[in-house]
UniProtKB/Swiss-Prot annotation:
EC top class, as a word: transferase
Binding partners and assembly: Homotetramer.
Subcellular localization(s) per the UniProt record: Cytoplasm
Alphabetical list of SMART domains matching this protein: NDK (SM00562)
Gene Ontology molecular function, alphabetical: ATP binding; metal ion binding; nucleoside diphosphate kinase activity
EC number per UniProt: 2.7.4.6
Name of one Pfam family that matches: NDK
Name of protein: Nucleoside diphosphate kinase
Binding site for ATP: 11, 59, 87, 93, 104, 114
PROSITE patterns: NDPK_LIKE
Catalytic activity from the UniProt record: a 2'-deoxyribonucleoside 5'-diphosphate + ATP = a 2'-deoxyribonucleoside 5'-triphosphate + ADP; a ribonucleoside 5'-diphosphate + ATP = a ribonucleoside 5'-triphosphate + ADP
Sorted UniProt keywords: ATP-binding, Cytoplasm, Kinase, Magnesium, Metal-binding, Nucleotide metabolism, Nucleotide-binding, Phosphoprotein, Transferase
InterPro entries in the record: NDK-like_dom, NDK-like_dom_sf, Nucleoside_diP_kinase
Amino acid sequence: MAIERTFSIIKPDATERNLTGAINALIEKAGLRIVAQKRIRMTREQAETFYAVHKARPFFGELVDFMISGPVVVQVLEGEGAILKYRDVMGATDPSKAADGTIRKLHAKSIGENSVHGSDAAETAAIEIAQFFSGNEIVG
């Protein structure tokens, strides 16, 4: 399997509970390296751009409001099969359906406040990474 990069967001419900370290430990335990990380407060424009694919969905406004409600930690993760591996580490979007030991099973409050985001494909990862990081901020 090839070395690849994926994008992660530790969402406001997790940062408000000081879970960044616990989530990072699960990421690293899975064999992924955190090659870029920063804590930011997303602007409304950033959140709307990031979630533009959901603009027509009824939950779009609520999602944007949630993502700007507090700090988030944006990350670039690297490793063999990083995209699928991180999606496995995150667990199902609905924490009640997530496997034991996954980030969402352990830490998510609800399907809406599900603690983390991860890219779903290589193309998406590249776009998402570029939205928040310049090349010199990613140190592998």
